[in-house]
């Protein structure tokens, strides 16, 4: 189990995300779908008894499990109010399921994918309708074979995006608009059965995306100069704002309907923690911890918790060094090391 499960107390179910199979990138010794890896599994909260599962990647060869928490919400599909679950995957897809049965509420098709007999690849993979939150093919790089989602690897010259940096941070849901919000990291990695390594000269960046939960279609998307799939994630408030903390130290607020940046505050360090909001004394507060926790991103380290309200008086700090946006050093072949930099 990757992260803390979600709980529906009315249904008496918990929803757990499971990790990918091992070895991560070599499927030659583990044929079949490898259940229940890279899946969402629903269990009876009182007994632990299995209720249903949905596998997002069959026979995972790319470390594309889902380390971000699922989101539980209610929404109308086909004219009926349904108890839904949204799961954002590292490949930049959002699976919207009926959390009672595990069946997709947004059409999901088992599509044929490229094959590699030595890797014992699955014949198909589940692909949801709608828009992905990340590019599905690598940007071209000289001397490398360009790969797309579910390109199998056996040689060490194939590259792919968004790679396993896709999404680790929590998403959010706004019941007023019906929008889902997610962060994504986009990086280029060279894959082989022994691991994935950085590709020098390629850029790394992040995306913040709003999707309409009724259609799984993109409403807006913003690019940021760091791997936004790690760290803070997003917080949606009833006032129509989406908050996000970045590796560049900024705590930002966006208009939830348009994506327009309305406010930013420099915390002085990598603002990686999920934001929190609460009300006390009739006033709403929003808080975030700024500690620069991601060693691989070479963030400025700190030890601060910032709390904000309307009319607050504190001044921002000086910004930390900007996180690198271009990979400068490749990891040693076969190590699987993901993000070394000069």
List where the protein language model places each region.
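Noncatalytic, solvent-exposed loop/strand surfaces
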Residues: 1-341
């Amino acid at each position: 189990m990757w992260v803390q499960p979600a709980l529906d107390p009315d249904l008496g179910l918990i929803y757990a995300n499971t990790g990918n199979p091992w070895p991560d990138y070599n499927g030659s010794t583990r044929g079949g779908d490898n259940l229940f890896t890279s899946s969402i599994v629903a269990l009876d909260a009182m007994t632990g008894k299995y209720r249903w599962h949905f596998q997002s990647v069959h026979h995972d060869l790319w470390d594309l499990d889902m380390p971000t928490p699922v989101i539980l919400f209610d929404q109308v599909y086909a004219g009926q109010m349904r108890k839904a679950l949204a799961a954002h995957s590292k490949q930049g897809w959002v699976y919207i399921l009926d959390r009672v049965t595990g069946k997709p509420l947004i059409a999901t098709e088992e599509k044929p994918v490229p094959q590699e007999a030595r890797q014992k690849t699955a014949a198909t993979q589940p692909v949801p309708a709608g828009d992905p939150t990340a590019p599905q093919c690598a940007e071209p790089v000289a001397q490398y074979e360009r790969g797309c989602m579910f390109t199998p690897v056996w040689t060490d010259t194939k590259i792919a995006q968004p790679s396993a940096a896709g999404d680790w941070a929590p998403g959010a849901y706004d019941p007023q608009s019906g929008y889902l919000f997610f962060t994504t990291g986009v990086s280029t990695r060279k894959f082989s059965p022994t691991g994935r390594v950085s590709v020098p000269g390629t850029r790394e960046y992040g995306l913040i995306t709003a999707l309409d939960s009724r259609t799984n279609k993109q409403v807006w998307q913003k690019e940021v100069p760091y791997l936004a799939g790690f760290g803070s994630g997003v917080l949606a408030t009833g006032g129509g704002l989406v908050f996000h903390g970045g590796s560049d130290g900024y705590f930002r607020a966006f208009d939830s309907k348009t994506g327009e940046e309305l406010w930013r505050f420099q915390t002085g360090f990598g603002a990686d923690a999920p934001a929190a909001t609460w009300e006390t004394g009739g006033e709403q507060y929003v808080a975030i911890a700024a500690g620069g926790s991601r060693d691989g991103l070479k963030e400025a380290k700190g030890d601060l918790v910032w709390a904000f309200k309307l009319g607050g008086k504190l001044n921002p700090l000086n910004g930390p060094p900007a996180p690198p946006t271009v990979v400068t050093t490749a990891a040693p072949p076969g190590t699987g090391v993901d993000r070394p930099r000069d």
